[in-house]
């Protein structure tokens, strides 16, 4: 179950069942309700709504709303498109935002439902896929909503509780992930023989038409593949909808300053079907380079070279002077012998 909250004059709490068959529930004081999938030909114990539909096709299903409070409960009912948040979780557009996908295709038979205390009510709905719908995965949700005034905070509280609606539209499925905008920054150490660290950033872009996550590998290496260092324990990317992007920042420790470094970000795309099984696809990767000059060591080497050069020049000068003195002594001795 996923719970998200946002306060912008309107506080929204959204619960989406994404992986577990436990019904989604909301509770606040004496107000409490839950939602679950109806038991029918699609299944008796589903975690969410999931369909495979051809363009122009229609499916009918039911969401069940249960009032667990002590007073009658009236809830608004509507559908909305899904998207991946900056935190990597699925959320749904608020009611004031226009939906163009699953949120527009999903039509509940009622726009509001009143449920007696301790009772349940069925909310039938239809999902109609347009003839011109793009093949592939589309995600949204069917929501119940209760708006209450919070006089202490001076805002309205819109509590939303819903279930995910996933639709795979028939046609050619093209699952593709791309690694884009790879950048490498090296952070050296003051020690002449110490290793530094690197920061690798890149963007994961779902360029296909299927819902995909990716298993990540990041490594930094020197020339000819030497001095390779890999990042440890990278989590999988969140499941991205077609067209979505996810920015990644990976720190890599203990990187040797190999003068010219190359960072490679590699992704193993993971395709999950309606049954929950995962299929790995062909890996994709991209690289970027950066300079990593060990300046302290370079300075020491330059000083050593300068010192050796000075010693050699001084020795050469002394040798020249000694030879000149010896030649003068020889000349003087010859003159004395002949005089």
Q: How should each PLM-predicted stretch be described?
A:
Residues 71-98, 122, 128-176, 255-300:
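Terminal connector regions
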Residues 27-48, 70-122, 224-227:
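Surface-exposed binding patches on compact interaction domains or structured appendages
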Residues 55, 113-121, 235-246:
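Short proline/glycine- and polar residue-rich coil/turn motifs
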Residues 321-339:
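Cytoplasmic C-terminal tails of single-pass
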Residues 172-306, 312-317:
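Membrane-proximal extracellular "stem/stalk" segments
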Residues 56-62, 120-123, 135-141, 160-162, ...:
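Short, solvent-exposed loop/turn segments enriched in Ser/Thr/Gly
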Residues 1-27, 303-316:
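Secretory targeting and sorting signals
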Residues 34-69, 112, 179-195:
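Beta-sheet-dominated interaction scaffolds and their linkers
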